[in-house]
């Protein structure tokens, strides 16, 4: 997982409220188990409109998506986060998120930023013509016009995103501690160790 430090670029001024995961990635795309190519299915129904914002050359490869309240509601599907990543989105800014979507986004290295509606409205305005910047360390969203919006983030999530640590990475980072614990267990509970060794050898 790539570390998240600063994200800067044009932001897609989407702004729609109550966008569920079926809008983000339709169910027919869930048959795949690979993450590559899912960007083509992202917001597929909305892309039927030839004037849709997602196919606009102006916002091609934009790393930030500005959304409305309750983004990512509906059924749980990690493919929604995969699809956004495949589009090039590294952060989503919205007034609120579905808890499940927020968790899936975090596990896949997407930063979810919660800001009040007034800030969203201002960013939507700026995004029409100018870039937006997110600084994870400072926990701020800024614009070229001296706008500065602060956001809160769970310290654990911040640490993981800043260091590019997913669940596997976190486990590997504590490899020495795990090995030490296993050695102690073998000494203090040898009868359990025998069972573990038998399973490992099978």
Swiss-Prot record:
Highest taxon of the lineage: Bacteria
Keywords linked to the UniProt accession: Amino-acid biosynthesis, Branched-chain amino acid biosynthesis, Leucine biosynthesis, Lyase
Pathway field: Amino-acid biosynthesis; L-leucine biosynthesis; L-leucine from 3-methyl-2-oxobutanoate: step 2/4
Any one cellular-component term (Gene Ontology): 3-isopropylmalate dehydratase complex
Annotated gene: leuD
InterPro entries the record matches: 3-IsopropMal_deHydase_ssu, Aconitase/3IPM_dehydase_swvl, AconitaseA/IPMdHydase_ssu_swvl, IPMI_Swivel, LeuD
A GO MF term: 3-isopropylmalate dehydratase activity
Name listed for the protein in its UniProt record: 3-isopropylmalate dehydratase small subunit
Subunit structure: Heterodimer of LeuC and LeuD.
The keyword Lyase belongs to this UniProt entry's keyword annotation: yes
SUPFAM superfamilies, per the entry: LeuD/IlvD-like
Family under the similarity heading: Belongs to the LeuD family. LeuD type 1 subfamily.
Gene Ontology terms: biological process: L-leucine biosynthetic process
Record-listed E.C. numbers: 4.2.1.33
Lineage: Bacteria, Pseudomonadati, Pseudomonadota, Alphaproteobacteria, Sphingomonadales
Catalytic activity: (2R,3S)-3-isopropylmalate = (2S)-2-isopropylmalate
Principal EC category: lyase
Function: Catalyzes the isomerization between 2-isopropylmalate and 3-isopropylmalate, via the formation of 2-isopropylmaleate.
């Amino acid at each position: 997982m790539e570390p998240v430090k600063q994200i800067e670029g044009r932001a897609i001024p989407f702004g729609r409220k109550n966008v569920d995961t079926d809008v983000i990635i339709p169910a027919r795309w869930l048959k795949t188990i690979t993450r590559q190519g899912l960007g083509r299915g992202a917001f597929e129904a909305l892309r039927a409109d030839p004037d849709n914002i997602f196919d606009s050359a102006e916002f091609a490869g934009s790393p930030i998506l500005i959304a409305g309240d309750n983004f990512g509601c509906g059924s749980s599907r990690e493919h929604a986060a995969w699809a956004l990543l495949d589009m090039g989105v590294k952060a989503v800014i919205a007034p609120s998120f579905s808890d499940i979507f927020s968790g899936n986004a975090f596990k896949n290295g997407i930063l979810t930023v919660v800001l009040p509606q007034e800030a969203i409205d201002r960013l939507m305005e700026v995004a029409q013509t100018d870039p937006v910047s997110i600084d994870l360390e400072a926990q701020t969203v800024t614009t070229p016009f001296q706008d500065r919006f602060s956001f809160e983030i769970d310290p654990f999530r911040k640490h993981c995103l800043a260091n590019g640590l997913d669940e596997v990475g976190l486990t590997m980072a504590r490899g020495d501690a795990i090995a030490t614990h296993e050695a102690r267990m073998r000494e203090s509970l040898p009868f359990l160790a025998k069972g573990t060794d038998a399973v490992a050898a099978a």
